[in-house]
Amino acid sequence: MNTASATQTIELKKDQGGQGQGPGYFARRNVWDWLFAVLVIAGASWAFLRYNAAMDGYEKAILVGAVPAMVWLGWFWRPLRALAAVVAAASLLAIWLYQTPAGVADLARADQVFLLKYFISSQSAILWMSMLFFMSTAFYWMGMFKRAGDTFELLGSRLAWVAVALALVGSMVRWYESHQIGPDIGHIPVSNLYEVFVLFCWMTAAFYLYYEDQYRTRGMGAFVMLVVSAAVGFLLWYTVVREAHAIQPLVPALQSWWMKLHVPANFIGYGTFAIAAMLAFAYLIKQSASESRWYKLAPLWLLGVVLCFEPIVFRQSAAESGGSYWFVYFGISALIVGTILFGRRRIAERLPSFEVLDDVMYKAIAVGFAFFTIATVLGALWAAEAWGGYWSWDPKETWALIVWLNYAAWLHMRLMKGLRGTVAAWWALVGLAVTTFAFLGVNMFLSGLHSYGEL
């Protein structure tokens, strides 16, 4: 079902180009489209009236600009409407529960009110997100091997949706909580490693769910959710060892409205690059399904090396926490590699066609490259404001340029030379390694203007 329906989707999209002109864009909107638009406008108006005193001019402009963007997204992909409604309702409920009878917010109620303590305070929601992403990954993988695989994959997909919703609720409530700590502490939750890992998790999952819906196949979820679960694993370790969930004031360099645009754009790029790499890995697994020679199974061994040697990278921090966490991480990583190795034939049967994997890989890289380009330009403008120059060859800037050049070359070869298949897949995997170093490795091993803390 996965391969046939997804391939038909590609063919249908190709055929649509030759059809005649239909009704105009707004003429195609129905009553539910317009109702969603009205609700978005009403919500933004309420937010402006309620919180405009705490906003500067740039933040007000962002709020106004977010209205047409949100309406368009809801019209473009209808499942986002339900997601937006659930996130808004849960976030407003949390804000209401924080209020005392005197009408003043009290963050101590997070330990006193049942719903806040166990479900929708920022930390509770993010912990639920973490558990549900793990469960989603497990169900997707069970779907690879079980006879009733479609049912397990459906459960994995639904759990991923709930996890995305809880991640957004946690982020929204954390934003509110930061403002209640102090007027100078409140900030959009994209300012430190903890917050951006939450951002990475839900953005990556949301983009994958879009591709899953568009191509009508859940066969890619097992691989994409692996990278989300890996990020969640790091997030939990970082939370426990570094107490990173605590809300801290921004360092001066981050007290800029450019951050509100630069960081989300950057992580759309990171998330979609990660999707492309995991689909490239799936492509190589499908390609080597019937291979028995060990040296031809290089993609599997590559995954094993990357996963199993990650504890060595964090060996200093692992020692601080007793090493037990990374020992478990090593064991789970080895189990995953072994499962893929011995079950590759069954996995290949459940994966979509090579054409679908290649097409989604290309589209994910194209989207990521567009947003990463925007983020790089915004970062240059931010640097000019913070440090007086658009470019200083700081290690972070240099590696961002390397990432940009890598994917620019990939897209150039795709569009000009028809790059596809094995070479494209390996290149996408290498691209993820480069991107990961640019994101984490630079902060760990190099120093520069972007070093705002240590792991």
Positions of PLM-derived features:
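Hydrophobic cores of alpha-helical transmembrane segments in multi-pass integral membrane proteins
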Residues: 2-111, 119-247, 254, 261-350, ...
